Regions:
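Alpha-helical support elements that line or immediately flank enzyme active sites
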Residues: 56-77, 112-126, 222-240, 361-368
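Function-dense linear segments that define catalytic or interfacial modules
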Residues: 34-48, 52-73, 88
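Short, glycine/charge-rich beta-strand/loop segments that flank catalytic centers
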Residues: 6, 55, 80-83
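Glycine-rich, mobile lid/loop segments that gate access to catalytic sites or pores
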Residues: 69-167, 181, 185-188
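Terminal-appendage/accessory-domain detector
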Residues: 1-53, 150-163, 170-392
Length: 392
């Protein structure tokens, strides 16, 4: 999907304003924002805040990067924009609540548009009044549905949220005014979008930061599958598991994931990212789930993987938290082994570093991954300059 969008936007032409991942030439701000956001979410590495159930980084960082290029902002202003944007998206996501999500909205994009708007507004140096107008403008474009999970449209929704947020900030800068009381008013955003109106989302503004609770992804698939992945990796590593030793696998998950990442028979690589059974089969058969090529169309028809899938049973359990799961493996020799894992548990920094570096190395290689980790590129230069120098 990112290749299609990239080719479409390149064909549109326009000013060479902003950095695009994978392109030598720059593109107009809106094009760059769209491509980078779609690419970031399609890769499925973007992190999650489980309080809001949203992925904020692809939307906000893409918007902030493009606007920074337009304004020639240094890395300090860029970083501030990213932080306030992500914090905004998280807090609005929490305010919307589970009701909004279970109604069918893709909260990453519905709440995320406000993150991209605020990030862009900060980098543009908008006043409080104009920032409020930008948020009001953005509310008219907030969209995204969970029905698109497993399709190319899911990352597109993220791209739309990033782009519309940037547009909203520029419109407000030029003087477009909106109703700024859009969240709580009768027939406003909250009631229209099935919000829970959770005021706890706005407690301790400027004192407590929800961004500190963002959890990183270590695998290139839906974050709802990651506690299962970590549980199974533990069992594979500690019991030398392989398919020939396994009689069956039972996986206990929070019921909400039956509708999110439990595609029984994925038809393409994107759907594999939302399939407990196929991801388990990949791990048992020694595939690396940090690699993008693991989630290929061809693997949907891999006979070894399909054989392993038939051994897996997914069981919904109300006692299992949203961030945890339990994997039980019944071996052919009669033994039963199990592991429970909660991805909300805080990791040691050394463990976090190891996992992030392994993921990055799978995508970018060892040399660039080391530069990303050790380079001090948050100096006074334009953020995209470092990216162009090291990633293109």
């Amino acid at each position: 999907v990112s290749k299609i969008i990239k080719n479409l936007e390149k064909g549109n032409g326009g000013k060479k304003e902003a950095f695009v991942i994978g392109l030598i030439d720059r593109l107009p701000i809106k094009s760059a924002t769209l491509i980078n956001a779609v690419t970031g979410h399609a890769l499925d590495y973007d992190d999650t805040h489980f309080g809001s159930l949203g992925h904020t980084s692809s939307i906000v960082i893409s918007a902030a990067l493009a606007v920074s290029d337009k304004k020639k902002s240094n890395a300090k202003v860029f970083k501030e924009g990213v932080l306030v944007g992500i914090e905004t998206a998280i807090r609005i996501g929490i305010w919307l609540g589970r009701k909004h999500y279970h109604q069918g909205f893709h909260i990453t994009s519905t709440a995320g548009i406000f993150g991209s708007t605020v990030a862009a507004a900060h980098i543009l140096g908008l006043s409080k009044k104009k920032t409020m107008n930008a948020i009001g403008i953005a509310s008219a474009s907030s969209s995204g549905i969970k029905a698109q999970f497993g399709s190319m449209v899911k990352p597109l929704q993220v791209g739309f949220a990033a782009t519309r947020g940037v547009e909203s900030a520029f419109m407000a800068e030029k003087g477009i005014k909106a109703d700024t009381n859009i969240f709580d008013k009768l027939d406003g955003y909250g009631t229209t979008y099935s919000a829970e109106f959770k005021d706890c989302a706005f407690v301790n503004l400027g004192k407590k930061y929800f961004i500190n609770d963002v959890k990183f992804k270590f695998h290139a698939c839906c974050h709802g599958t990651h506690s299962v992945i970590e549980s199974l990796i533990y069992l594979i590593d500690n019991y030398q598991l392989k398919d020939s030793l396994i009689n069956r696998i039972e996986v206990f998950i929070n019921p909400q994931y039956l509708k999110i990442c439990n595609i029984e028979k994925p038809k393409n690589g994107i759907e594999i990212k939302f399939s407990f059974k196929m991801i388990i089969a990949l791990l048992v058969n020694k595939f690396n789930t940090t690699r993008l090529d693991t989630f290929s169309d061809a693997n949907c028809h891999n006979k070894k993987l399909l054989k392993t899938c038939n051994k897996v049973k997914i069981i919904a359990d109300d006692k299992i938290l949203e961030t945890e799961s339990e994997v039980m493996v019944i071996l052919k020799d009669g033994r039963t082994i199990r592991k429970k894992y909660d991805i909300s548990d805080k990791l040691k920094f050394s463990t976090l570093e190891k996992k992030l570096f392994f993921k990055s190395k799978s995508l970018l290689g060892k040399r660039i991954s080391k530069k990303l980790w050790y380079d001090n590129f948050f100096d006074n230069s334009l953020p995209s300059n470092w990216l162009e120098k090291n990633l293109q």
